[in-house]
């Protein structure tokens, strides 16, 4: 690695020193770098999708039940440019949500169709971001209020709106109400080809989630 002469970090840059073990040279640690190493999302989350009308949202479902609510990569706001995010939706401010202890007591209970945040775009458009699943609101990502462009810039999963925690007994029903990655891609393909689309969770799942008991 080339560095400037006055670089204060120069003493800390990695420099390989040849090492021999059992008559064989040990390869430098940089040789073990995998450019295609699975991302955090690929390793620990399952991707699901929720449609509000024709607008897609992503639910990243962790093995411990924690769910990250995000914009799907094809959400139109990402192409339009995001100008603001607000968790004060009028009758309640989601950012004032407070949970306590390991049991996350006190958090707001949200329905799939509950408005989680308001998003405005550079062209003046407004989107009511849905909660996508029924669950307890654990926290909201206030960083995207201060820097809305993070939703466009951060890698998958990092630019989330909120963390929700569904009840264990509701997990199977919630997963069934969402689209899998394969179903999502099939829906997008059908839309592009003008074919009948897989029922969106904005219609199908909202009714199904209402049947799930709190």
Swiss-Prot record:
<dbReference type="Pfam" id="PF01597">
    <property type="entry name" value="GCV_H"/>
</dbReference>
<dbReference type="GO" id="GO:0003785">
    <property type="term" value="F:actin monomer binding"/>
</dbReference>
<dbReference type="GO" id="GO:0032433">
    <property type="term" value="C:filopodium tip"/>
</dbReference>
<dbReference type="GO" id="GO:0048813">
    <property type="term" value="P:dendrite morphogenesis"/>
</dbReference>
<feature type="region of interest" description="Disordered">
    <location>
        <begin position="189"/>
        <end position="214"/>
    </location>
</feature>
<feature type="compositionally biased region" description="Basic and acidic residues">
    <location>
        <begin position="201"/>
        <end position="214"/>
    </location>
</feature>
<dbReference type="GO" id="GO:0051015">
    <property type="term" value="F:actin filament binding"/>
</dbReference>
<comment type="similarity">
    <text>Belongs to the ABITRAM family.</text>
</comment>
<dbReference type="InterPro" id="IPR039169">
    <property type="entry name" value="Abitram"/>
</dbReference>
<dbReference type="InterPro" id="IPR033753">
    <property type="entry name" value="GCV_H/Fam206"/>
</dbReference>
<dbReference type="GO" id="GO:0030027">
    <property type="term" value="C:lamellipodium"/>
</dbReference>
<dbReference type="GO" id="GO:0030833">
    <property type="term" value="P:regulation of actin filament polymerization"/>
</dbReference>
<comment type="function">
    <text>May regulate actin polymerization.</text>
</comment>
<dbReference type="GO" id="GO:0005634">
    <property type="term" value="C:nucleus"/>
</dbReference>
<protein>
    <recommendedName>
        <fullName>Protein Abitram</fullName>
    </recommendedName>
</protein>
<dbReference type="GO" id="GO:0030425">
    <property type="term" value="C:dendrite"/>
</dbReference>
<dbReference type="InterPro" id="IPR011053">
    <property type="entry name" value="Single_hybrid_motif"/>
</dbReference>
<dbReference type="GO" id="GO:0051489">
    <property type="term" value="P:regulation of filopodium assembly"/>
</dbReference>
